[in-house]
Amino acid sequence: MNLSIAELRKSYGRAELNEDAAHADPLQQFDQWLGQAIAAQLPEPNAMTLATVGSDLRPSTRIVLIKGYDERGIVWFTNYDSRKGRQIAGNPCAALQFHWVELERVVRIEGLVQKVSDQESDAYFDSRPLDSRIGAWASPQSQVIAGRGVLLANAARYGAQFMLKPPRPQHWGGYRLEPDLWEFWQGRKSRLHDRLRYRMAGGQWVRERLAP
């Protein structure tokens, strides 16, 4: 490569994040920013990085899609037997991060994770396209397989078995992260970025500005 990675840089300055304009409730602030990311037609504004830590204390990350949020927390769906599922079972502390590059914004969320109810998982599973529902059966997520043919053979087998109405596998469902910390980052000029952190203390959200 002729171009040095160290020379890659970008100036920020599209917007600002001030305490006077920011919501006192971080969920409302998140709702506003996510809505703006969707309105801006960003590619997959619902994509978020999920960080978990296993019993070996090694962290791992992956991209998942937010499928719902309210005062109870942030929801996504996945395979419970996957690496992330096993890590969450052993250590429910996790972190999420949204990065909306075009808006020069990042949102970080930390908290404890638990499974959503079977009713919530069933309702979302039944709303998915048929191929996705078959795929939940066909993929032994995070396991070593001999080749892609294994997945295709599994998909054909389960497709023939369940036809148009595959039930939700017991190893597949939703998780909800209940936030106890939020951080909103807005890129600013001269690397003097805006960072507002919300932390739960005494049952209330405390908002603080952090140095960038």
From Swiss-Prot:
Sorted UniProt keywords: Flavoprotein, FMN, Oxidoreductase, Pyridoxine biosynthesis
Pathway: Cofactor metabolism; pyridoxal 5'-phosphate salvage; pyridoxal 5'-phosphate from pyridoxamine 5'-phosphate: step 1/1; Cofactor metabolism; pyridoxal 5'-phosphate salvage; pyridoxal 5'-phosphate from pyridoxine 5'-phosphate: step 1/1
Cofactor(s) needed: FMN
Single Gene Ontology BP annotation: pyridoxine biosynthetic process
Binding site for FMN: 62-67, 77-78, 83-84, 141-142, 185, 195
Function field: Catalyzes the oxidation of either pyridoxine 5'-phosphate (PNP) or pyridoxamine 5'-phosphate (PMP) into pyridoxal 5'-phosphate (PLP).
Cofactor binding annotation: Binds 1 FMN per subunit.
GO molecular function terms listed in the Swiss-Prot or TrEMBL record: FMN binding; pyridoxamine phosphate oxidase activity
Protein name: Pyridoxine/pyridoxamine 5'-phosphate oxidase
Presence of keyword Transport: no
Pfam family, one: PNP_phzG_C
EC number: 1.4.3.5
Signal peptide: none
UniProt subunit comment: Homodimer.
Keyword Cell inner membrane: no
Binding residues annotated for substrate, in chain numbering: 9-12, 67, 124, 128, 132, 191-193
Family (UniProt): Belongs to the pyridoxamine 5'-phosphate oxidase family.
Catalytic activity: pyridoxamine 5'-phosphate + O2 + H2O = pyridoxal 5'-phosphate + H2O2 + NH4(+); pyridoxine 5'-phosphate + O2 = pyridoxal 5'-phosphate + H2O2
Stored Gene3D superfamilies: Electron Transport, Fmn-binding Protein, Chain A
